[in-house]
Swiss-Prot record:
It holds the Pfam family HSP70. SUPFAM superfamilies: Actin-like ATPase domain (SSF53067), Heat shock protein 70kD (HSP70), peptide-binding domain (SSF100920). This is Chaperone protein DnaK. It comes from the Bacteria. The lineage of its organism: Bacteria, Pseudomonadati, Pseudomonadota, Gammaproteobacteria, Lysobacterales. The gene is dnaK. Belongs to the heat shock protein 70 family. HAMAP family: DnaK. Residues 605-628 are annotated as: Disordered. Residues 605-623 have a biased composition (Low complexity). The modification Phosphothreonine is found at residue 200. The keyword Iron does not apply. Keywords: ATP-binding, Chaperone, Nucleotide-binding, Phosphoprotein, Stress response.
Length: 641
């Protein structure tokens, strides 16, 4: 059995880890970095860039560079959060046929967020494979604890598209708790994991206990906001810079995708700098131009101003902490340790708000960028049998139920129920002689069904005619360890049953996933060919340069026919390099190598001939010296002055 890798698929950055010699190890990517930007770009020549290379070219290719797509995954286009995002990103977001939010390139190619996420997962998979020297097919992938069923299913689909069998979907705060608590001694304790990442926020209250020699991680309660994170903090800075520039120059930079992308990079840098300094300067020369000429943006930003801009966002993260504590039946003073996870927790204002709420300083010995991936790898080790005596008891973050008469949401499984779990409830018909019932499955906390997330609708037909209230229809909910729901409805009298695995009310169909898997495979092959072509070109360019240098150095020493052959081969290769025929480039590279060897051989022979002539001259000089007779002489003193 191969390794089960742990992947933190983040909004801003992603990270991959494996169990190695009983310890979790974070693996560096091909650039030598321990985290990879969750960014995918499509270039005009058809290349797909992932990670740092995609981020570097974002300013010049904003409409085809996709970032923060985790905020779109498993969401409807009409969701308020998606509509809010449209004005903040330079790339296109549109509604797919099933109502889901998809993204679009500048040449109108449409893609599901799952496809973009799959590209990042592929990079993580390749990173692990390069380190292990073997193929990887299984993974544990983390998601925000507050992700609903649609978002979890969509994440699993992304893994499938990337060629991964997702063995488990695990909540990010729970993974961080695993990373923190696995090796810790000191008895039972309750910890709060405050996870403020690039796009999502979670808080989980977790009890770590020793039970019969087994370390048990039990999630007591979880809460959060799947549209609150570092991206929102960045957007506040961007809005401030845009407004200040508009006041000064009368130009709205929101309408310029290129300027917007430069602003995003600058805002993120400024935010990070202000975590360690009191003031920074945002300086963007030639940010735009009008009839009067180019315009430059130069704005000072203080830490105090940044904190004022994001104060409500920080406060917004504290309310779920209060709810989670209440749901767990605890007070802040009952919490032994507070763990910070996610890059945005490096902000001093966030750390202070958390310390004020829980009444204790958060721990600083957990790496906020890597803890989640490490926890995922540990869970992978548990599933593979490599990590013993660890039991993880997670919860469902939101209540699950069905719509009943009058548009009421009737809960069947309450939020914060330990998973996996099953629950059933019996319902009846609303009208006389009703032969079918529609089961509308929902997720959320609102009393009115219409305000909750619709997961699925299905019909149970063939109910025998009877007065209203007489038929007995049993609705059963079954949540697996990934937090994914299966629902069944059964007529108790006829035993007719209808089962459905929730496929995220909308989501991707099996056919779409298969197409995307095939597309990803084809692209992998295409990418491989592209890299091989680039390598062939690079090798050819190196040889062309070396050959030109050789002609300059040795051309005068060899005959014209040798130089003629080399220059002909050189010209042929230069022509081939401009094309896309790898075989032709390689063949002409070989021809030039052979011609170059004949050049070096001729030059060496010419030099040896020159050396022979020099040796002959030296011999004659030596013979002449041998013919000289030594003579005695007497020194004559000249006394004349």
């Amino acid at each position: 059995m191969g390794k089960i890798i742990g992947i933190d698929l983040g909004t801003t950055n992603s990270c991959v880890s494996i169990m190695d010699g009983g310890k979790a190890r974070v693996i560096e990517n091909s650039e030598g970095d321990r985290t990879t930007p969750s960014i995918v770009a499509y270039t005009k020549d058809g290349e797909v860039l992932v990670g740092a290379s995609a981020k570097r070219q974002a300013v010049t290719n904003p409409k085809n560079t996709f970032y923060a797509v985790k905020r779109l995954i498993g969401r409807k286009f009409t969701d308020a959060e998606v509509q809010k995002d449209i004005s903040h990103v330079p790339y296109g977001i549109l509604a797919h046929d099933n109502g889901d939010a998809w993204v679009q390139t500048s040449d109108a190619k449409r893609m599901a967020p799952q496809e973009i996420s799959a590209r990042v997962l592929e990079k993580m998979k390749k990173t692990a494979e390069d380190y292990l020297g073997e193929k990887v097919t299984e993974a544990v992938i983390t998601v925000p604890a507050y992700f609903n069923d649609s978002q979890r299913q969509a994440t699993k689909d992304a893994g499938r598209i990337a060629g991964l069998d997702v063995k488990r979907i695990i909540n990010e705060p729970t993974a961080a708790a695993l990373a923190y608590g696995l090796d810790k001694k000191g008895g039972d304790r309750k910890i709060a994991v405050y996870d403020l990442g690039g796009g999502t926020f979670d808080v989980s209250i977790i009890e770590i206990a020793e039970v019969d020699g087994e370390k048990q991680f039990e999630v007591l309660a979880t809460n959060g906001d799947t549209f609150l994170g570092g991206e929102d903090f960045d957007n506040r800075v961007i809005e401030y810079l845009v407004d200040e520039f508009n006041k000064d120059q009368g130009i709205d930079l929101r309408k310029d995708p290129l300027a917007l992308q430069r602003l995003k990079d600058a805002a993120e840098r400024a935010k990070i700098e202000l975590s360690s300094s009191q003031q920074t300067e945002v300086n963007l020369p030639y940010v735009t131009a009008d009839a009067s000429g180019p315009k430059h943006l130069n704005i000072k930003l203080t830490r105090a101003k940044l904190e004022a801009l994001v104060e409500d966002l920080v406060k917004k993260s504290i309310e779920p902490c209060r709810t989670a504590l209440n749901d767990a039946g605890l007070r802040a003073s009952d919490i032994n340790e507070v763990i910070l996870v996610g890059g945005q927790t490096r902000m001093p204002k966030v750390q202070q708000a958390v310390a004020d709420f829980f009444g204790k300083e958060p721990r600083k010995d957990v790496n906020p960028d890597e803890a989640v991936a490490v926890g995922a790898a540990i869970q992978g080790g548990v599933l593979a049998g490599d990590v013993k005596d660890v039991l993880l008891l997670d919860v469902t973050p939101l209540s699950l139920g069905i719509e009943t008469m009058g548009g009421v949401f009737t809960k069947i499984i309450e939020k914060n129920t330990t998973i996996p779990t099953k629950a059933s409830q019996t319902f009846s018909t609303a009208e006389d002689n009703q032969s079918a019932v529609t089961v509308h499955v929902l997720q959320g906390e609102r009393e009115q069904a219409r305000f909750n997330k619709s997961l699925a609708k299905f019909d149970l037909s063939g109910i025998e005619p009877a007065p209203r209230g007489m038929p007995q229809v049993e609705v059963s909910f079954d949540i697996d360890a990934n937090g994914i729901l299966h629902v069944s409805a059964k007529d108790k009298k006829t035993n007719k049953e209808q089962k459905v695995e929730i496929k995220a009310g909308s989501g991707l169909s099996d056919e779409e996933i298969q197409r995307m898997v095939a597309d990803a495979e084809a692209n992998r092959e295409e990418d491989k060919k592209f890299h091989e072509l680039v390598q062939a070109r690079n090798q050819a360019d190196g040889l062309i340069h070396a050959t030109r240098t050789a002609i300059t150095e040795h051309g005068s020493k060899v005959g014209g026919d040798v130089i003629g052959k080399v220059e002909a081969a050189l010209s042929d290769l230069e022509t081939a390099v401009k094309g896309d025929d790898k075989a032709q480039i390689e063949a002409r590279t070989k021809t030039l190598e052979e011609a170059g060897q004949s050049l070096y051989a001729a030059a060496a022979a010419a030099e040896q001939g020159g050396s022979a002539d020099a040796a002959s001259g030296n011999a004659q000089a030596s013979k002449a010296a041998d013919d000289v007779v030594d003579a005695e002489f007497t020194e004559v003193k000249d006394d004349k002055k």
